[in-house]
Amino acid sequence: MMKAFLVLDNGTIFEGESFGYETESVGEIVFNTSMAGYQEILTDPSYCNQIITLTYPMIGNYGIHPDNMESSKIQASGLIVKEYVDLPSNFKSEKTLSQFLKEYKIPAIQGIDTRKLTRFIRTNGSPNGGIFVASEYSPSFLEKVKSFPGIINADLAEVVTTSSKYIFGTHTGKKFKLAVYDYGVKTNILRLLDANGFAVTVYPAKTPSEEIMKEGTDAFFLSNGPGDPAPLDYAIASTQKIMEKRYPLFGICLGHQIIGLSLGKKTEKMKFGHRGGNQPVKNLETGQVEITSQNHGFAVIDDQKQDEPISFLNLNDHTVEGILKSGYPLLTVQYHPESAPGPNDSRYLFQKFYDLVEKTKKG
């Protein structure tokens, strides 16, 4: 294996071995605490411009299978692990993780003290950094890392969105048409919307909402996606028009944040975000605690408006996980009820949204 270097923007250098494509890449360094699901994580569009540290110490054990793709390709800029396993034990595996990374020209580094790196991120926040495959260190590596602009105020949704609208699943026998705004939508979200009875049509992020309304839809869904919601002026404007017309609306992750901004709330960059499959969230309506899958680095700030109460609350740091609007058919969650990977505690929300649409249409 070739030697590789992980370089952080403060000058910290980690030396390891390459097991991906022999290239270099820069991005925001983040960590995910999930014990499994590396293929779903790597192909999640929400990781655009990010290099992922997996805290579980042994990665690659079960290989790669097409059914576990959350988009058409690897979306992350790189992968950092403690130990890579090149001999997967899984009857469904079709290739190794290393082969998968090389197929999409993504660098990866092993032999890193991921515990030390994760503790650094928790203390100092998510740094910019880069993976460089080379026989020896060069000062130019740090220069390239420092030239990375970061993800704040960057419109990454336009990078990962579909280039044209398309139908997902089948529309035959479906009662309600659902327009999905693709800001980086995961495939399992679309699967569950389809499975719960919606006739799903997916639209590019910048499609004017008036255009979709003219085509005809019963409800709107705002998808997950990467980065900072604040620069997505077009998405905020479309959402405000959707709410003016009182269409039922469901937002997950970035979609939840866009709805928050559309209501006049503010968002903030988190120190190191929530990424993993074990975040406890309390449903404030039922009092039930759900273990959730999450992947975000920004959060909606609670402005304590009485007619826009918090519906879900993170029990680790008390960040907003969902908001309501009095008298409006709205459902939002910061976390990922579709999991992939992660627990299935919150999958009922897809049926809940269907019931909300049905109730709204009945008047």
Curated annotation (Swiss-Prot):
It catalyses: hydrogencarbonate + L-glutamine + 2 ATP + H2O = carbamoyl phosphate + L-glutamate + 2 ADP + phosphate + 2 H(+). Residues 1-173 are annotated as: CPSase. SMART domains: CPSase_sm_chain. Pfam families: CPSase_sm_chain, GATase. Keywords: Amino-acid biosynthesis, Arginine biosynthesis, ATP-binding, Glutamine amidotransferase, Ligase, Nucleotide-binding, Pyrimidine biosynthesis. The keyword Nucleotide-binding applies. Residues 177-363 form the Glutamine amidotransferase type-1 domain. One of its GO terms (molecular function) is ATP binding. GO terms for biological process: 'de novo' pyrimidine nucleobase biosynthetic process; 'de novo' UMP biosynthetic process; glutamine metabolic process; L-arginine biosynthetic process. PROSITE patterns: GATASE_TYPE_1 (PS51273). PANTHER family: CARBAMOYL-PHOSPHATE SYNTHASE SMALL CHAIN, MULTIFUNCTIONAL TRYPTOPHAN BIOSYNTHESIS PROTEIN-RELATED. NCBIfam families: CPSaseIIsmall, PRK12838.1. This is Carbamoyl phosphate synthase small chain. It comes from Leptospira interrogans serogroup Icterohaemorrhagiae serovar copenhageni (strain Fiocruz L1-130).
